[in-house]
Amino acid sequence: ELLKRILEKKRRFISPFFYNVLMKKIGLILIIFTIIGCSNQESLDVESANKQGILLLDNGTEPQGLDPHIVTGVTEHKIIIALFEGLTMQNPQGEGIIPGAAESWNISGNGKEILFRIRDDAVWSNGDPLTAEDFVYSWRRILTPALGSKYPDMLYAVKNAEEYNKGLIKNFDQVGVEAIDKKVLKVTLRTKTPFFLKQLAHYATYPVHPKTIEKFGGISNRDSQWTRPANMISNGPFTLTEWSINKVIKVTKNERYWDSDNLKLNGIHFLPIDNESTADRYYRSGKTHNLNIIQTEKISKYQDEFPEEFKLEKYFGTYYYRINTDIFPLNNIKVRKALSLSLIHI
């Protein structure tokens, strides 16, 4: 503004053409400085984040979505478990599961019926109580054929769940899930399934807020806007406050969460860093608290430089080569056998 006043006073000594060009350039410079200023305000380093109780997390790629009944990726999983909570959860201290939204459960003698007691203080982020009926609705949603979920089989151990998902039966009342009262959920399995409680820690079985789902298109709408920050209502330890595509997803401590007193973090910033070199640079320069994947050639270096921080975790996966057997020389079975013999089989 001051610069503009000075130029206005000197305007009679400047040609109109040069004056207009100069004003446009000044405007462009101001826009650039504004953008840089906003960018700097939004960025945090580890030192600043520590003071605010915020975790800066290298989360790999940009998530495809945040609907627990539709997405399938590891990237999405990390965010969803911060926003939602199922009946059980993975034990962060080791193997097995621990109570989540359900404070306890009773298994019948034949192992086919389970009664889950949902916590009295378990509520949604808007204050609505979390009920057994919310789980009935949510499981009906993931099993609804029109939704096209990729993980409906996570509930196939439930009586008639597979049949409903495949359209063999139309009445969901025949599926083995029932709200006995507001806080008691009865699940009937097709047969004794020892690993079922562990399956319930998977985000595909998590509850969604029925009123919100209905508000934004209904139970089978895949393109719903309910996962936007302004719309999402969740039941986990954090709530969604910002989703800037390809930049950051921010979640903030949910003060209504039943175990909020034990939450050490005030928030998490999930950063989509899909380049290993960039991730390495971010970690070393103090822009993230973690490094998701270490480049193979740098593993020993990190073990030496960061012996306390370095963690080598097991990862179960399937790795394979798919080859075109119609082209030379791969159309020769002897060549393919030779390739097979050259590989290390685990």
Region spans (language model):
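N-terminal lobe/hinge region of extracytoplasmic solute-binding protein
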Residues: D58-G109, N231-S234
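Bacterial signal peptide processing site
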Residues: S39-Q41
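Surface-exposed binding/hinge segments that line
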Residues: R117, V136, L147-E214
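Aromatic- and charge-enriched surface segment that lines or borders ligand/interaction sites
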Residues: E103-Y151, K186, Y282, P329-N331
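Alpha-helical secondary-structure segments
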Residues: T131-S138, K182-T188, G236-P237, L265-G267, ...
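Extracellular/periplasmic solute-recognition and catalytic clefts
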Residues: T241-T252, H269-P329, K337-A338
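Gly/Pro-rich hinge or "lid" segments in bacterial periplasmic/extracellular proteins
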Residues: N91-P92, F172, L189-L263, G267, ...
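A structural "hinge/loop" feature
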Residues: T61-H77, A101, D128, T144, ...
